[in-house]
Amino acid sequence: MNNDFSYYLRKFLSEYLPREKGFNSNTIDSYRYSFILLLNYLKDVGIKAEKVKIIDLTKDRIVDFLNYLENNRNNSISTRNSRLAAIHSFFKYLQYEYPDYIDEYTKILNIPFKKAKTKQMSYLTVEEMIKLIGVIDKSNKYGYRDYMIILLMYESAIRVSELINVRLIDFRFSKPYSIKIVGKGNKQRYVPLSEQFIEKVQEYVLSLNNKKLETDFLFTNHSNNKLTRAGVSHILNKYVIIAKKNNPSLFKENVTTHTL
């Protein structure tokens, strides 16, 4: 098929994302723009849009495109990761719809998300983190939940207002592991996660003893409803107070204030 790329990209954007994945128009527009940028890049390196074939999209070429975004367009690491997420999604789709070049698809899907140089939660030291989770009783359902909330906040630098909306579908459970975080203005960013943390998420979901759907919120309250910002703030403050009693020199800054 001479125009295999345009054919499958059109099906991906107009059929697969809205009908099978249930993505909203804002997310689809973001994905579409990612491919507009890719096509413009390919034009710059001598491949016109109407001539692009799937075989042209190699791992090396995708990596060059991502570096171009960061170095030539001055895109942030977060934006770079968002473009890569769109590309990953397309090649996951191709694995089943057009598996002719599946070995190359696998290489592209193994391109990792790039880690930011600094963590936003720099005010929470490793020592404070260890002390904080050390006072949590993980033997009960809600203690285990609180433990996972604090681990996720430290691992991803997610804010409370973003954390309460996290769903299972937001995690990528295959390499490269990541979480999609939706922030203010419905802006999305993709944050890399460690394999160890992904394993903890899977263990946590299994511990719930009820079938969670991909679209369900990961963290819920006693009524099985989504946690509120105030609810998470209460959880954080509770453990900080306990940890402070044992370690008065730690937690000089207000954790909750920084994470809202």
Where are the regions that the model predicts?
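Conserved catalytic core of the tyrosine transesterase superfamily
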Residues: 1-260
